[in-house]
Amino acid sequence: MEAKGAAQWSSILVPSVQEMVKEKTITTVPPRYVRSDQDKTEVDDDFDVKIEIPIIDMKRLCSSTTMDSEVEKLDFACKEWGFFQLVNHGIDSSFLDKVKSEIQDFFNLPMEEKKKFWQRPDEIEGFGQAFVVSEDQKLDWADLFFHTVQPVELRKPHLFPKLPLPFRDTLEMYSSEVQSVAKILIAKMARALEIKPEELEKLFDDVDSVQSMRMNYYPPCPQPDQVIGLTPHSDSVGLTVLMQVNDVEGLQIKKDGKWVPVKPLPNAFIVNIGDVLEIITNGTYRSIEHRGVVNSEKERLSIATFHNVGMYKEVGPAKSLVERQKVARFKRLTMKEYNDGLFSRTLDGKAYLDALRI
């Protein structure tokens, strides 16, 4: 029986890139992974020399003496970047090291074990790739493990509850810790925007609010310039909190028409605004287009935790912002309608969000 409120979206089953790299001595990239359609936009490696990517200090954000100035910085980061690094978030670094180690162990399980967690036909959760809608579609050079974590009744019974111990308990705690961080950030955003709690905070602090996780594994590639680890896109959710699992860089964000490599700070989270928050804020806060690139020598791993509005809630521009700005820039629709449209498409920059503009 399908869990209450759950909906079925699917992605076509594809081979494991990790296994393909492990089993064969690959010197050239298989045709289905060659991305001649890749964005050839210049990569600006010196960007951080000219201007600093925003860094938000959680401790200052929560202190009565420094809150106002840090909320201003947060507001600027969300308006001008849609992206920032979060330091002093309060989650113990030794616990985060445990999360990272167990994610690596999970991807290194024997294939026979991993098959238990593989995507099933007509489902999108599990090991595999997402947004694969046709057999001739070009694929990313990556494996991912995607699953819903909250609310508990939306968990697939063959996924989260069956994860090996202690990994399952570790992820349970990580889910709770990151959710607390996300709720604080969203509350501070609402403060900066001067909008009512029910227009933003309460949408993400509700029994129906959805939290999901995607663990990403990007194997080394003999021709890294021929492939893409993660297709350029903006996140379709409200807020994303990303943690780099190992020390290999590969995340790039698009700023002022150029791809900017992100250099993660030690023990920091990378936080980005998703399309749903752009809709709710009527375009005041902007989701950011980003991609993952790979290299020829080392694997890269990360974990993204997505925070979103409940499935049958309606989303649209906050009424108080529409009244202030005299215009609604996006359509109103339920999250189910939003996701039905989303999962019928391939990833393509911010094209889906653009289709919802008025």
UniProtKB/Swiss-Prot annotation:
Family matches, as InterPro entries: DIOX_N, IPNS-like_FE2OG_OXY, IPNS-like_sf, Oxoglu/Fe-dep_dioxygenase_dom, Plant_2OG-oxidoreductases
Tissue: Low expression in roots and leaves.
Keyword Oxidoreductase: yes
Keyword Iron: yes
Fe2OG dioxygenase domain mapped to chain residues: 209-309
Induction field: By virus infection.
Molecular-function GO term, any one: oxidoreductase activity, acting on diphenols and related substances as donors, oxygen as acceptor
GO annotation (BP), single: leaf senescence
Swiss-Prot/TrEMBL keywords: Iron, Metal-binding, Oxidoreductase
Annotated Fe cation binding sites: 233, 235, 290
Top-level taxonomic group: Eukaryota
Family: Belongs to the iron/ascorbate-dependent oxidoreductase family.
PANTHER family (UniProt xref): OXOGLUTARATE/IRON-DEPENDENT DIOXYGENASE
Note: Unlike the homologous protein NCS1 of Coptis japonica, SRG1 has no norcoclaurine synthase activity.
Official protein name in the record: Protein SRG1
Biological source species: Arabidopsis thaliana
Organism lineage string: Eukaryota, Viridiplantae, Streptophyta, Embryophyta, Tracheophyta
Gene: SRG1
